[in-house]
Amino acid sequence: MVDKSDLLRPVDVATRIGAVLFTVGQVCTIAGITKMQLDLWTVRAAIPTLGAKQRLYDADAVEHVMLIAQARDLGFSVDAAIEAAAAFRARTTRVRPGAIAA
């Protein structure tokens, strides 16, 4: 007798989440930042967004924002945080499904 659970296969959640788009409010909540911070970082760090009437961020962009927030929490200036996040992302480059092209 076959156990029905043997029919299941691993689920690649990262691929599915990569296709989800987040609103400004959702990104702020996830990253623990204000809309003003997100607006500034989006422009200064050239974080790509989608959406005509409302900015939307993919999981890759949210990761970028969270790295900047982490650096700010460590006491980095905004410019230093943006540079540190970019350097970290360059060192840890991986395939990011569904990422918005910059």
Model-flagged regions — what are they?
Residues M36:
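Key DNA-contact positions within bacterial/archaeal DNA-binding proteins
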Residues M1-T29, V43-A102:
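Arg/Lys-rich, alpha-helical DNA-contact motif
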